[in-house]
Design a protein with these regions (language model features):
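Feature captures the FAD/FMN-dependent oxidoreductase FAD-binding
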Residues: 1-25, 64, 71, 122-129, ...
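FAD-site-proximal beta/loop scaffold in flavoenzymes
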Residues: 20, 42-52, 155-206
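Residue-level detector of alpha-helix initiation sites
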Residues: 24-26, 69-71, 163, 203
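A Rossmann-like FAD-binding core segment of flavoenzymes
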Residues: 80-167, 261-293
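A conserved FAD-binding loop/helix module that cradles the flavin
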Residues: 199-244
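Surface beta-strand/loop "capping" patches
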Residues: 231-273
C-alpha cells in the first residue's frame, strides 16, 4: 500500500489483509447540472453542516434546500435553530429520500414545507444568490411549464445524494456493483480480491452510523481471521440477485460454508410500498417470506436468512 500523512510523509506499507473504509462524498451542483447563475451561497448540506457546527459560521439567513436526504433534513432543523428562515425543501422524487423520523422532527415540527416532485430550474444572483425558481416535474422528471414558483433566498443547500469513494477500489481491479456504486462483497465483507475487505459507505450508503459500525466490526473480524487462517477453503458460492421492487443488495455473494448460523442481507426498495412481503426464492421455490407494513427507498431494509435455508439452494442463486 502506498500512503502518506503529515507526520511520516510518503510511505510504503505491507500487510496480509486490507480493509477499504473510504466512505463517500456528496454530490455537488456540477454533478446534477442545475441551470442558472453561479453566485456564492450554494453549498452541499455537509459543507454547511461543517461551517455551522464546527467552524461556527452562519451560511445564510434565508434558505432553500434541494433534496430530502437525511443530512439536508437535519440541516433544515439546524438552520432554523440558528435563526435562519428555511422556506422549503424541494425533492425531485414523489417520495422523500430521508428517514421518516427526520421528516417529522426536522420539517413538520418546524413548519417547513416539503415540495415533492419539484426541482430547481434556475438560480439567479450576481455576487450572492438572490432568487431561486422551482418547478413541478412530470413522471419523466422533466419540468412542467407554467408551474414555476419563485423563492427570494440567499442560500441553497444541496442534499442530492452521496457517492461512495471507490477510486482505489476500481484501480485495484475489484468487481463493482452498479446498483450500489460499491464493490461486490461476500458474507464476510471480502471483495473479489482475496484478502481485501470493505465496509461502511464505501460499500453502500447507510442510513445510520450504527449500521456502519456493525458492518465495519464484521469486516475487521473477517480480515483478522483471514490473516490467521487464510482464504476460505470451500468457495462454493450463492449469488443474491435483485428481484422486483428491490435494489442494492449487500452482500451480493454468500459462501454457505463460511456462514455460522445466519446471514444478514440489506437492501433498499425501488419505490414506496405498503403491506408487502419480501420473498426469498431459489429455482422457483420460496425459501422464506418477510412481511413489511411499509418500505421506502429512503430507509434501508434488512432480512436475516438462516443457514438452513441456504443449504436448500440448488442452482447457486437466490
Amino acid at each position: 500500500v502506498h500512503a502518506m500523512n503529515k507526520k511520516n510523509g510518503y510511505m510504503k506499507l505491507e500487510g496480509k489483509s486490507i480493509i477499504l473504509n473510504m466512505g463517500c462524498r456528496e454530490r455537488t451542483r456540477g454533478a446534477i447540472a442545475i441551470p442558472g447563475d453561479r453566485p456564492a451561497g450554494v453549498f452541499t448540506a455537509g459543507a454547511a453542516q461543517r461551517y455551522v457546527n464546527i467552524e461556527g459560521y452562519m451560511v445564510g439567513k434565508k434558505v432553500l434546500i434541494l433534496g430530502s436526504g437525511d443530512i439536508g433534513l437535519i440541516m433544515a432543523r439546524r438552520m432554523s435553530l440558528e435563526g435562519a428562515k428555511v422556506v422549503g425543501c424541494v425533492e425531485l422524487c414523489p417520495y422523500s429520500n430521508g428517514l421518516n423520523r427526520n421528516i417529522v422532527q426536522c420539517l413538520n415540527d418546524y413548519d417547513i414545507p416539503l415540495y415533492l416532485s419539484h426541482t430547481i430550474t434556475d438560480i439567479q444572483g450576481d455576487k450572492r444568490v438572490e432568487k431561486v425558481i422551482v418547478s413541478k416535474v412530470d413522471e419523466k422528471n422533466q419540468p412542467i411549464p407554467g408551474t414555476e414558483m419563485e423563492f427570494d433566498v440567499d442560500t441553497v443547500l444541496l442534499s442530492v445524494g452521496l457517492i461512495p469513494e471507490n477510486e482505489l477500489t476500481r484501480s485495484a481491479g475489484i468487481t463493482m456493483d452498479p446498483a450500489t456504486s460499491g464493490p461486490v462483497v461476500y458474507e464476510n465483507m471480502e471483495t473479489s480480491a482475496e484478502g481485501i475487505f470493505a465496509s461502511g459507505n464505501v460499500v453502500h450508503v447507510h442510513d445510520l452510523v450504527d449500521f456502519v459500525t456493525a458492518e465495519s466490526q464484521k469486516a475487521g473480524k473477517s480480515a483478522a481471521e483471514y490473516v490467521k487462517n487464510g482464504e476460505t477453503k470451500d468457495q462454493t458460492c450463492i449469488d443474491i440477485k435483485n428481484g422486483d421492487g428491490v435494489n442494492g443488495i449487500v452482500p451480493q455473494k454468500v459462501r454457505p460454508s463460511n456462514v455460522d448460523k445466519k446471514v444478514e442481507v440489506m437492501f433498499r426498495a425501488r419505490n414506496v410500498f405498503t403491506d408487502v412481503a419480501i420473498k426469498v426464492r431459489s429455482n422457483g421455490e420460496e425459501l422464506a417470506s418477510f412481511k413489511r407494513e411499509h418500505m421506502a427507498p429512503g430507509e434501508m431494509e434488512k432480512i436475516v436468512i438462516p443457514k438452513a435455508f441456504l443449504d436448500k439452494v440448488e442452482n447457486g442463486e437466490i
